Amino acid sequence: MKVAADPDPSLVSQRDMEPEAAKDKDSFRNYTSGPLLDRVFATYKLMHTWQTVDFVRRKHAQFGGFSYKRMTVMEAVDMLDGLVDESDPDVDFPNSFHAFQTAEGIRKAHPDKDWFHLVGLLHDLGKVLALAGEPQWAVVGDTFPVGCRPQASVVFRDCTFQDNPDLQDPLYSTELGMYQPHCGLENVLMSWGHDEYMYRMMKFNKFALPPEAFYIIRFHSFYPWHKFGDYQQLCNEQDLAMLPWVQEFNKFDLYTKSSSLPDVAALRPYYQGLVDKYCPGILCW
């Protein structure tokens, strides 16, 4: 399925995005102050200490068989009623509401792209790992490539990586690390978390979504790349072609966060219809 007819999706959302969603953007992703800062910093300190090449490979092996649980997409959404993301400085309410906020923001700006609406609902479902006993530092937060030196825009980079053993490795501590120039992000080992898990889960269960959807899910938390432009030395032409979709998605992932919670019961039938269309039935997680 190809969805390349609109090469710059931002042209649509700049016109149609709600004013409430666009205001006060500078207040989001504040990693210098705020009531949740201590919790957020502690999560990233653990993440940046223990996310290594060896750790990520072990997690791929542990979860790659998708034998944790069998359930529908909507059952996974309901599970997120019990999760508050400890890496998020912006919200302190269950992640299930954020899923519907994101999806509805996309639906308003892109009414003709129902697959994109569903991506909004799906994007954080990999966080069910935190409800399966995984520590949040191995599930939530911004992602980054392992096996190479963290670049400047990684959150808390200068004060959280001191104890990461990979940074003592003569190869992994270089800018390219274990990668070839412009190898493509599909060939990069990203820090383990809900993005990579959900991407692989969708592939395993053969979701009938376009390539853009899989790409958004896999890299939506890779802020050092899609927001700050770092890690260009690893990117290829496909990454640059997909970047506008990830950036477009990010507007809704980030700027729809609000303490005004959606009426989930009213929205549920519409999204159940999308699930039935693109990823029906009981799935392997």
Swiss-Prot record:
Catalytic activity field: myo-inositol + O2 = D-glucuronate + H2O + H(+)
Catalytic activity, EC: 1.13.99.1
Residues annotated to bind Fe cation 1: 98, 123-124, 253
Cofactor note: Binds 2 iron ions per subunit.
GO cellular component: cytoplasm
Region (Disordered): 1-28
Protein name, UniProt field: Inositol oxygenase
Origin species: Bos taurus
Taxonomy of the source species: Eukaryota, Metazoa, Chordata, Craniata, Vertebrata
